[in-house]
Protein backbone atom coordinates (compact mmCIF):
# COMPACT_ATOMS: atom_id res chain seq x y z
CA UNK A 1 0.00 0.00 0.00
CA UNK A 2 1.36 3.44 -0.80
CA UNK A 3 1.83 6.00 1.96
CA UNK A 4 -1.08 8.03 0.62
CA UNK A 5 -3.46 5.16 1.37
CA UNK A 6 -3.22 5.17 5.16
CA UNK A 7 -6.17 6.58 7.05
CA UNK A 8 -4.61 6.08 10.49
CA UNK A 9 -0.95 5.85 11.48
CA UNK A 10 -0.20 4.64 15.01
CA UNK A 11 3.26 5.41 16.40
CA UNK A 12 4.53 2.82 18.87
CA UNK A 13 3.73 -0.91 18.99
CA UNK A 14 3.43 -1.39 22.72
CA UNK A 15 0.18 -2.41 24.39
CA UNK A 16 -1.58 0.90 23.68
CA UNK A 17 -0.38 1.06 20.08
CA UNK A 18 -1.37 -2.52 19.33
CA UNK A 19 -4.83 -1.96 20.82
CA UNK A 20 -5.27 1.35 18.96
CA UNK A 21 -4.23 -0.16 15.63
CA UNK A 22 -6.48 -3.18 16.13
CA UNK A 23 -9.50 -1.06 16.95
CA UNK A 24 -8.90 1.37 14.07
CA UNK A 25 -8.48 -1.45 11.55
CA UNK A 26 -11.48 -3.38 12.88
CA UNK A 27 -13.53 -0.24 12.27
CA UNK A 28 -12.55 -0.28 8.61
CA UNK A 29 -9.68 2.22 8.68
CA UNK A 30 -6.59 1.48 6.59
CA UNK A 31 -4.12 1.40 9.47
CA UNK A 32 -0.32 1.44 9.70
CA UNK A 33 1.44 0.71 13.00
CA UNK A 34 5.02 2.00 13.13
CA UNK A 35 7.51 0.69 15.71
CA UNK A 36 11.10 1.88 16.06
CA UNK A 37 12.28 -1.45 17.49
CA UNK A 38 12.68 -4.70 15.58
CA UNK A 39 10.17 -6.38 17.91
CA UNK A 40 6.76 -5.16 19.06
CA UNK A 41 5.49 -5.28 22.64
CA UNK A 42 8.84 -5.48 24.42
CA UNK A 43 7.49 -3.88 27.61
CA UNK A 44 4.46 -6.20 27.57
CA UNK A 45 6.86 -9.11 27.99
CA UNK A 46 8.41 -7.49 31.06
CA UNK A 47 5.23 -6.25 32.73
CA UNK A 48 3.99 -7.89 35.88
CA UNK A 49 7.28 -9.69 36.36
CA UNK A 50 6.93 -11.28 32.88
CA UNK A 51 3.36 -12.37 33.71
CA UNK A 52 1.69 -9.23 32.26
CA UNK A 53 -0.88 -7.69 34.56
CA UNK A 54 -3.54 -6.91 31.95
CA UNK A 55 -5.70 -4.61 34.07
CA UNK A 56 -7.03 -4.19 37.59
CA UNK A 57 -10.35 -5.64 38.73
CA UNK A 58 -12.15 -2.55 39.95
CA UNK A 59 -14.49 -0.03 38.43
CA UNK A 60 -13.19 2.97 36.51
CA UNK A 61 -13.49 5.24 39.54
CA UNK A 62 -11.05 3.02 41.43
CA UNK A 63 -8.48 3.24 38.67
CA UNK A 64 -8.82 7.03 38.40
CA UNK A 65 -8.63 7.41 42.20
CA UNK A 66 -5.36 5.45 42.30
CA UNK A 67 -3.74 8.25 40.30
CA UNK A 68 -5.12 11.09 42.44
CA UNK A 69 -6.05 14.43 40.88
CA UNK A 70 -3.87 13.90 37.77
CA UNK A 71 -5.85 10.72 37.04
CA UNK A 72 -8.85 12.67 35.77
CA UNK A 73 -7.41 12.48 32.26
CA UNK A 74 -8.14 8.73 32.33
CA UNK A 75 -11.94 9.13 32.37
CA UNK A 76 -12.41 9.28 28.60
CA UNK A 77 -10.04 6.38 27.87
CA UNK A 78 -11.65 4.17 30.51
CA UNK A 79 -15.12 5.06 29.26
CA UNK A 80 -14.09 3.84 25.81
CA UNK A 81 -12.77 0.47 27.05
CA UNK A 82 -13.80 -0.74 30.49
CA UNK A 83 -12.05 -3.33 32.63
CA UNK A 84 -14.73 -5.86 31.69
CA UNK A 85 -14.30 -5.12 27.98
CA UNK A 86 -10.53 -5.47 28.31
CA UNK A 87 -10.86 -8.88 29.97
CA UNK A 88 -13.43 -9.97 27.36
CA UNK A 89 -11.10 -8.82 24.56
CA UNK A 90 -8.31 -11.13 25.72
CA UNK A 91 -10.55 -14.04 26.66
CA UNK A 92 -12.14 -13.92 23.18
CA UNK A 93 -8.64 -14.33 21.76
CA UNK A 94 -7.83 -17.39 23.84
CA UNK A 95 -6.23 -15.77 26.87
CA UNK A 96 -8.23 -16.81 29.94
CA UNK A 97 -7.64 -14.51 32.89
CA UNK A 98 -7.60 -14.68 36.67
CA UNK A 99 -7.93 -12.04 39.36
CA UNK A 100 -5.36 -12.22 42.14
CA UNK A 101 -5.88 -11.06 45.74
CA UNK A 102 -4.32 -7.71 44.87
CA UNK A 103 -7.02 -7.15 42.24
CA UNK A 104 -4.53 -7.46 39.39
CA UNK A 105 -5.75 -9.38 36.37
CA UNK A 106 -3.24 -11.81 34.85
CA UNK A 107 -3.42 -14.48 32.16
CA UNK A 108 -4.11 -17.88 33.75
CA UNK A 109 -0.90 -19.11 32.11
CA UNK A 110 1.14 -16.41 33.92
CA UNK A 111 2.88 -15.78 30.58
CA UNK A 112 3.13 -12.29 29.14
CA UNK A 113 3.97 -13.89 25.80
CA UNK A 114 0.41 -15.24 25.60
CA UNK A 115 -0.91 -11.67 25.85
CA UNK A 116 1.49 -10.39 23.19
CA UNK A 117 0.74 -13.32 20.88
CA UNK A 118 -3.00 -12.65 21.20
CA UNK A 119 -2.49 -8.97 20.35
CA UNK A 120 -0.30 -9.77 17.34
CA UNK A 121 -2.73 -12.40 16.08
CA UNK A 122 -5.64 -9.99 16.41
CA UNK A 123 -3.60 -7.24 14.72
CA UNK A 124 -2.94 -9.52 11.75
CA UNK A 125 -6.60 -10.52 11.49
CA UNK A 126 -7.65 -6.87 11.68
CA UNK A 127 -5.85 -6.06 8.45
CA UNK A 128 -3.56 -3.44 10.00
CA UNK A 129 0.02 -3.32 8.74
CA UNK A 130 2.92 -3.50 11.20
CA UNK A 131 6.21 -1.85 10.19
CA UNK A 132 9.09 -2.75 12.52
CA UNK A 133 12.45 -1.01 12.74
CA UNK A 134 10.94 2.19 11.35
CA UNK A 135 11.14 5.09 13.79
CA UNK A 136 9.13 8.24 13.23
CA UNK A 137 11.65 11.07 13.27
CA UNK A 138 9.13 13.85 12.81
CA UNK A 139 5.39 14.48 12.70
CA UNK A 140 4.30 17.48 10.63
CA UNK A 141 0.92 19.06 10.08
CA UNK A 142 0.90 20.93 6.79
CA UNK A 143 -2.72 22.00 6.57
CA UNK A 144 -5.54 19.60 7.41
CA UNK A 145 -3.49 16.40 7.33
CA UNK A 146 -0.30 14.98 8.84
CA UNK A 147 3.03 13.80 7.49
CA UNK A 148 5.01 11.16 9.34
CA UNK A 149 8.72 11.25 8.53
CA UNK A 150 10.77 8.06 8.90
CA UNK A 151 14.26 7.26 7.59
CA UNK A 152 12.58 5.17 4.88
CA UNK A 153 9.69 7.36 3.72
CA UNK A 154 7.24 10.22 4.13
CA UNK A 155 3.76 9.01 5.10
CA UNK A 156 0.80 11.36 4.59
CA UNK A 157 -2.29 10.56 6.65
CA UNK A 158 -5.35 12.32 8.10
CA UNK A 159 -5.08 10.76 11.60
CA UNK A 160 -2.14 9.99 13.91
CA UNK A 161 -2.27 8.19 17.25
CA UNK A 162 0.79 8.68 19.47
CA UNK A 163 1.46 5.69 21.74
CA UNK A 164 5.21 5.95 22.13
CA UNK A 165 5.22 5.31 25.88
CA UNK A 166 8.09 6.27 28.12
CA UNK A 167 11.52 5.08 29.11
CA UNK A 168 10.71 2.52 31.78
CA UNK A 169 13.86 0.46 31.24
CA UNK A 170 17.41 1.21 29.98
CA UNK A 171 17.62 1.49 26.22
CA UNK A 172 13.92 2.19 25.73
Regions found by a protein language model. Name each.
Residues 51-99:
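Glycine-rich active-site loop/strand segments that organize a redox cofactor
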Residues 9, 25-49:
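Glycine-rich FAD pyrophosphate-binding loop
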Residues 13-16, 20-25:
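Small-residue (primarily alanine) positions within well-ordered alpha-helices
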Residues 46, 113-114, 118-172:
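Predominantly flavin-linked oxidoreductase catalytic cores and closely associated redox partners
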Residues 69-77, 91-117, 145-147, 157-159, ...:
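Helix-loop-beta segment of a Rossmann-like dinucleotide-binding subdomain
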Residues 2-16:
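Beta1/beta-strand and adjacent pyrophosphate-binding region of the FAD-binding site
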Residues 13-14, 35-37, 48-49, 56-57, ...:
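Fold-independent oxyanion-binding glycine-rich loops
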Amino acid sequence: MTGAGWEVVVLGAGAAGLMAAIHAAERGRRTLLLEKNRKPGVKILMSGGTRCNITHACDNRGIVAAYGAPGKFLHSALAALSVQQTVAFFEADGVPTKVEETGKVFPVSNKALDVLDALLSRLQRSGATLALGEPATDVRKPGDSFEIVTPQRLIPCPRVILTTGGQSYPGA
